[in-house]
């Protein structure tokens, strides 16, 4: 409503109020007076609201008029300042000649005032950025990159010299991310040694827009982050949703189930889709790194004596085109090499060096098996290389161990005859090529001392495994007895471990029985052949 309509409405309300007051003075019934008094109160409240609206409309119109007149006034002020500067510049030499060094020209204060103005502008920019919500990167101690919602608390210079800001993470998942309660007040005594977060300096180029948590995708069975009593956000899974309240079960066995509201739950930071995308990127692009498995090492990888050595193919050096994204490996690291190359004038797609004749593709990094020392890796590579060469030079075996020249069968003795009769096979079946069921036992009869020693060693190792498994079963049963009626989750896991240990014990006992049977057969044959 404009100013005129508000004024007319205000006059109407005041006239109605006067009529109501006259009616109250006429001496009506008590019921009618109650209605009139209520109407009187409503009219007074309405008049106050209308007056407030009228004042705000008049204020806005005055501000608009001032804005229209401000450019002209600003030009007049600038012109006046220009005239003062000219007069000071003309009068300053004369004053200096007349009075020596009595006065200092105001022009000398120009740089100081300019510096002061620049500091004021920087202070204003810092005040504007302070409190802004952004999405900032966080590198965990094991090297993964995650983006967390954070709040800017100040501006600082980054490590590489670029413009940066100090941020505090809003949803801390670790104690090192939890903001220190005394930092913002300036009362923290530990400073850099504080176990809580005093903020992290992040480059402005790495910041992303703030992302509001989308709770619409959360349902029963979904993975999430839930806030615990310690103020940290832990990984959990939703078990029930009821009128905005979420029942979550934390992944950690040390934390119990909890019921939280919408402000205490978040979608996971890394969804399954993003993880699969990152995995596919890491496996699909072979120009960054190549993983060497512990079981299969080709001849080209035998030259990799340590993880820092690079395996470079001739096609990577000679090729003039780059098949990988520029600086794509820096997505998974803290590297700034791409930015340094760009500042030094490198153009994407060209080779390194002064005349752009260097390599185009990045160097392949060879990743050796985890948990192995360099000596073990070198020994494994050399062994597999020697085995591969020996396998290629070794001629194929054309004859069996017991074959005779000319194709004549081996001489048969009385024990072969007895074995054939006891096993129910026809004579000559061995010469026909069909392997008998007791061939392994027969080989054990004629085995050497080294084979029998190996059999005894296998039997001893199996007995040790049985004893170890029995000790594990006893310890699991004791743990079950301690946790009876306490933790259902821990009891269920212990039951699974107990069932697995009992299955393993049964397999080991069967293996022990088979080895004992073979050993008895070998001993029986030895006794029968001694006359």
UniProtKB/Swiss-Prot annotation:
Region (Disordered) residue spans: 91-133, 267-289, 385-409, 426-446, 509-531
Matching SUPFAM superfamilies: CCCH zinc finger, Tudor/PWWP/MBT
Compositionally skewed regions (Low complexity) per UniProt: 107-117, 426-438
Residues found modified as N-acetylmethionine: 1
PTMs per UniProt: Ubiquitinated in case of infection by HIV-1, leading to its degradation. Ubiquitination is mediated by the CUL4A-RBX1-DDB1-DCAF1/VPRBP complex that is hijacked by HIV-1 via interaction between HIV-1 Vpr and DCAF1/VPRBP.
Tissue: Widely expressed.
Biased composition (Acidic residues): 118-129
Cellular compartments annotated: Nucleus
UniProt cross-references to InterPro entries, sorted A to Z: G_patch_dom, Znf-CCCH_4, Znf_CCCH, Znf_CCCH_sf
An annotated GO cellular component: plasma membrane
Positions of the G-patch domain: 333-379
Identification of the protein by name: Zinc finger CCCH-type with G patch domain-containing protein
Highest classification ranks of the organism: Eukaryota, Metazoa, Chordata, Craniata, Vertebrata
Record gene name: ZGPAT
């Amino acid at each position: 409503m404009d100013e005129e309509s508000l004024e007319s409405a205000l006059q109407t309300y005041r006239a109605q109020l006067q009529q109501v007051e006259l009616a109250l003075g006429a001496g009506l019934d008590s019921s009618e007076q109650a209605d009139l008094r209520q109407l009187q109160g409503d009219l007074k409240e309405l008049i106050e609201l209308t007056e407030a609206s009228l004042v705000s409309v008049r204020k806005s119109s005055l501000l608009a008029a001032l804005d229209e007149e401000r450019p002209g006034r600003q030009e007049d002020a600038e012109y006046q300042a220009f005239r003062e500067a000219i007069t000071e510049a003309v009068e300053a030499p004369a004053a200096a000649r007349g009075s020596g060094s009595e006065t200092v020209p105001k022009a000398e204060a120009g740089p100081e005032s300019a510096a002061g103005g620049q500091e004021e502008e920087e202070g204003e920019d810092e005040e504007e950025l302070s409190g802004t919500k952004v999405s900032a990167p966080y590198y965990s101690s094991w090297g993964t990159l995650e983006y967390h919602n954070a709040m800017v608390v100040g501006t600082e210079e980054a490590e590489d010299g670029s413009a940066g800001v100090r941020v505090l993470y809003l949803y801390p998942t670790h104690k090192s991310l939890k903001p220190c309660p005394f930092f913002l007040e300036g009362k923290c005594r530990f400073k850099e040694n504080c176990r809580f977060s005093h903020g992290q300096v992040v480059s402005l180029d790495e910041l992303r827009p703030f992302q509001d948590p989308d709770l619409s995708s959360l349902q029963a069975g979904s993975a999430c982050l839930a806030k615990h009593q310690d103020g940290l956000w832990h990984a959990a899974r939703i078990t029930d949703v009821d009128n905005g309240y979420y029942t979550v079960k934390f992944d950690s066995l040390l934390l119990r189930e909890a019921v939280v509201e919408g402000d205490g739950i978040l979608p996971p930071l890394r969804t399954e889709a993003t993880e699969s995308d990152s995995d596919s990127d890491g496996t699909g692009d072979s120009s960054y790194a190549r993983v060497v498995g512990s079981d299969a090492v080709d001849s080209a990888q035998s030259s990799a004596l340590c993880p820092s050595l690079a395996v470079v193919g001739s096609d990577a050096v000679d090729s003039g085109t780059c098949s990988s994204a520029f600086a794509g490996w820096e997505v998974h690291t803290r590297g700034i090499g791409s930015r340094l190359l760009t500042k030094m004038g490198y153009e994407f797609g060209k080779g390194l060096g002064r005349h752009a004749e260097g390599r185009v593709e990045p160097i392949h990094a060879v990743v050796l098996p985890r948990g192995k020392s360099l000596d073990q890796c070198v020994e494994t590579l050399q062994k597999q290389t020697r085995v591969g060469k020996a396998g290629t030079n070794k001629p194929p075996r054309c004859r069996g161990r017991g074959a005779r020249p000319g194709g004549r069968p081996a001489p048969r003795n009385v024990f072969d005859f007895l074995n054939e009769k006891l096993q129910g096979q026809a004579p000559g079946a061995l010469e026909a090529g069909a392997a008998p069921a007791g061939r392994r036992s027969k080989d054990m009869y004629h085995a050497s001392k080294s084979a029998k020693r190996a059999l005894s060693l296998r039997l001893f190792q199996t007995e040790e495994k049985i004893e170890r498994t029995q000790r594990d079963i006893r310890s699991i049963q004791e743990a079950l007895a301690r946790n009876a009626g306490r933790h259902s989750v821990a009891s269920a896991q212990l039951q699974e471990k107990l069932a697995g240990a009992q299955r393993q014990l049964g397999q080991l006992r069967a293996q022990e029985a088979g080895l004992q049977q073979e050993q008895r057969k070998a001993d029986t044959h030895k006794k029968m052949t001694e006359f």
